[in-house]
């Protein structure tokens, strides 16, 4: 990452995109910083005002035109001379020659090969319980039933699912298994049996199983905590934040709030978890567009690994987010970024899932183009052993891929998911964030547009805002590591 000298400017946010043929630059101002992203190289630059303006003109004007324009714009600044501007233009040219600015799109041709790739299955989401002990109003799974019958997965089905994953994972060693619901702990004995079976055969097949457990917390006890801390690579704990927010939509079957029941259990869970992976995951709705207050509330409860997701629901639901909510939500993401940096400075950091971005590495280009791998590398398994592209398609009969006994038989649907990538969506052609979102969530696209290759526009805008904030946080952290004088939260 190249960091130039800074000149601070008044608070504000502006952004624009330079798209010229096969090159793409995204420029924006956030938290007092000028940020420039070169989309195809992934290079991120924090620059001063002059460099920011020069980059904006660089591809559409001559050197002389840029100099004249900058001299006019900065006429009241004696430090901005013709020589200074010329030197800045030369710096930009050097970055271009180094492949860190104005790089070409070299990846589109890779997308055409995706459908032909021989992929292996890397992960299964086991629907261990199609039933739940909560009655959350916004539940996409229809209170755990997935618009069908209540059911619990048997050990025999779970055992076969593990065998199916091994058989279809090729030479891949690390395999992911998520225990999902409904509420998985309503079938905890079978969870334990499945894990024990997988552990008993993983060495024989040169596999390493990494289990994740998602729970609403109602049935968490010492046995669950001990088991999860021994066997689960990650746990996901569902909590929406403040008591009044959480209890409004996450009620027990008797219509009472669940906050007071689960929070002490989650606190004990996290306390005993040590340095093992977890995160507390919430959902925000139209009812709590001030969702940062929920994040900070959870942090003050002692939870440091946090995620807060926008609700996925029908647009006419009373808690559905609206287009008019977006400016409020954008501001919330900025508030979150600033507060995270402030808390880090105070020695009480928190991690926000959507701000976890690696400026120096990150996913391979295939993953950045194709996304989560739903329907090809990742599948959901129902209590009866049916296969679906992911948990959000379970119960949609048209998306049934096959089952764990006969394998994938609906090749047409699988091919449709295999061809889902960022280049398959014409709406993504001019989007600066496309190599970070990988085209977005197929399920969200389907539920919003009726097509897995559609675009959920409001979701796109939220993602772009989160990414701008994530990049800003990452840049400031990087500057602090290098003791840069302008690394001020």
Question: Over which residues does each language-model region extend?
Answer:
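Acidic, low-complexity/disordered tracts enriched in E/D and polar residues
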Residues: 1-58
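Detector for the c-type heme attachment site
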Residues: 139-145, 275, 432-433, 446
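Radical SAM/AdoMet-radical enzyme domain recognition
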Residues: 158, 162-178, 187-311
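Short Fe-S-cluster ligation motifs
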Residues: 162-180, 455-489
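C-terminal accessory region of radical SAM enzymes
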Residues: 327-361, 391-438
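Short acidic, hydrophobic short linear motifs in intrinsically disordered regions
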Residues: 61-75
């Amino acid at each position: 990452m190249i960091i130039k000298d800074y000149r601070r400017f008044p608070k504000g946010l502006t952004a624009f995109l330079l798209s010229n043929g096969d090159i793409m630059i995204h420029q924006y101002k956030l938290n007092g910083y000028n940020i420039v992203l070169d989309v195809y190289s992934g290079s991120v630059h924090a620059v001063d005002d002059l460099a920011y303006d020069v980059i904006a003109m660089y591809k559409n004007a001559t050197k002389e035109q840029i100099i004249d324009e900058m001299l006019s714009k900065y006429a009241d600044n004696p430090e901005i001379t013709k020589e200074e501007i010329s030197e800045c233009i030369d710096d930009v040219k050097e970055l271009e020659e180094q492949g860190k600015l104005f790089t070409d799109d070299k990846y589109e041709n890779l997308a055409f090969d995706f459908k032909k790739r021989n992929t292996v299955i890397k992960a299964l989401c086991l629907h261990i319980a199609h039933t739940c002990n909560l009655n959350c109003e916004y539940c996409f799974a229809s209170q755990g039933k997935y618009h069908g019958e209540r059911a619990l997965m048997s050990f025999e089905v779970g055992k076969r699912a593990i065998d199916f994953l091994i058989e279809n994972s090729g030479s891949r060693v690390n395999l992911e298994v998520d225990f999902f619901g409904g509420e998985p702990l309503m079938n905890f004995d079978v969870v334990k049996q499945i894990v024990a079976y997988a552990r008993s055969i993983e060495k024989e097949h040169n596999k390493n199983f990494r289990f994740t457990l998602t729970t609403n917390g109602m049935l968490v006890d010492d046995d669950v905590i001990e088991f999860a801390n021994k066997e689960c690579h990650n746990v996901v704990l569902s909590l929406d934040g403040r008591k009044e927010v959480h209890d409004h939509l996450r009620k027990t079957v008797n219509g009472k709030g669940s906050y007071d029941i689960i929070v002490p259990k989650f606190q004990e869970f996290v306390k005993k978890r040590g340095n093992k992976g977890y995160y507390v995951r919430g959902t925000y709705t139209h009812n709590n567009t001030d969702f940062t207050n929920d994040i900070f509330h959870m942090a003050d409860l002692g939870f440091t690994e946090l995620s807060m997701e926008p609700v996925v629901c029908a647009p006419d639901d009373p808690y559905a987010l609206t287009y008019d909510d977006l400016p409020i939500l954008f501001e919330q993401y900025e508030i979150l970024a600033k507060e995270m940096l402030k808390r880090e400075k105070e020695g009480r950091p928190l991690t926000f899932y959507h701000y976890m971005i690696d400026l120096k590495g990150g996913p391979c280009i295939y993953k950045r183009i194709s996304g989560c791998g739903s329907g090809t590398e990742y599948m959901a398994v129902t209590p009866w052993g049916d296969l679906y592209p992911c948990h959000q398609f379970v119960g949609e009969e048209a998306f049934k891929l096959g089952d764990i006994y006969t394998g994938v038989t609906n090749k047409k649907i699988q091919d449709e998911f295999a061809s889902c990538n960022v280049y398959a969506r014409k709406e993504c052609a001019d989007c600066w964030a496309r190599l970070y979102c990988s085209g977005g969530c197929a399920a969200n696209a389907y539920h919003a547009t009726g097509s897995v290759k559609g675009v959920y526009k409001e979701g796109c805008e939220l993602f772009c805002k989160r990414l701008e904030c994530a990049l800003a946080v990452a840049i400031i952290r990087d500057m602090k590591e290098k003791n840069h004088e302008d690394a001020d939260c």
